[in-house]
Amino acid sequence: MIVDATLCYMETSTAKQQYMMLMALTQLPIDAIEMTVVVYNNIVKMKLPRQKYILRVKNEYDIENYPGFHYYVKSINIDKDSDKKWIEQVMYDTSGRAAARRIIVIDEVSVINMCEQFCTWIRNGKLYLEPLNYIEQATALAYTWLKCGGNSVITAFCGLGNHAPLEEVLMTLHVTGIKRLMKPLNFSELKKVAGNIAISPVKPVVGAEIFAVESGIHVDGIKKNPQLYEPYPPELVNASRRIVLGDMSGKSSIEAKLKEYNLVCGKIDTVKILEIVKQKSHDLHRAITDEEFCNLVKMIGCAGSAEKKISYSRYNTA
């Protein structure tokens, strides 16, 4: 069971943003959505989609005031300086009775040290694991917990609240065969709503540049066997592979880029184009843009010949 707690960290967002995030989350293969009382009060008048909801409350009186949730869990202040490695919480049902447990891993613990402990917890009943990402192992802890037979994990989009990133957990479960995706993941709406989150271009799963490749040998390898360099196809996350042209590019990169834009100029000297691309990239101290490449090919491959004609299927420099 995958629980997403992204909304718990959007209390200062507008009600519209909170609702849009909720709707975007329901399009992903998650099993429950957790939110705070503040967020719920903001969106309660809107039509909430059918879903299991967990409410993060301040005290037991909130359980009486907000009936109908799948579970309730009390908000806590985590003391990072505590000697404890984890905190155990009770999860309540709508009648206020203890129904499950949650363990928040708060210390700098690694997967290697937790496997045996996970097995012990699993034998002791229904348990939700909330691994925090203090040493960049939250995703690994979440995956290992579920692989060992754990029931549920708490995640958040892009690791909000120092949680295991939702997108990384979903993709890890897919590539390891624990929980296969039935359709591609689309995080575009989540990224739009969470516009104040700084997402690195190389952030796993959702980074804009994770399928960008420049090195000639890598481009050649991807053309022959994408699985050598990509753990999953870009289409699985609603993305596309992008060849970047720069001083690390090779002949395969030029050929692939020509094919990408359906550039037809008779006999094209790809070696000459590659030399110019590398020099231009070196002079500019950056990769050259697709527009610059198309103009370059037009200048080199078609100048002075009426018979040579560039066909732009995706692009037009005019």
Show which residues each predicted segment covers:
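Catalytic alpha/beta core domains of metabolic enzymes, predominantly
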Residues: 110-228
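Alpha-helical scaffold segments that flank or form the walls of functional sites
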Residues: 17-31
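N-terminal small/glycine-rich loop or linker at the start of catalytic domains
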Residues: 1-15, 115-128
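Active-site beta->alpha loop and helix N-cap motifs at the rims of alpha/beta catalytic domains
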Residues: 32-113
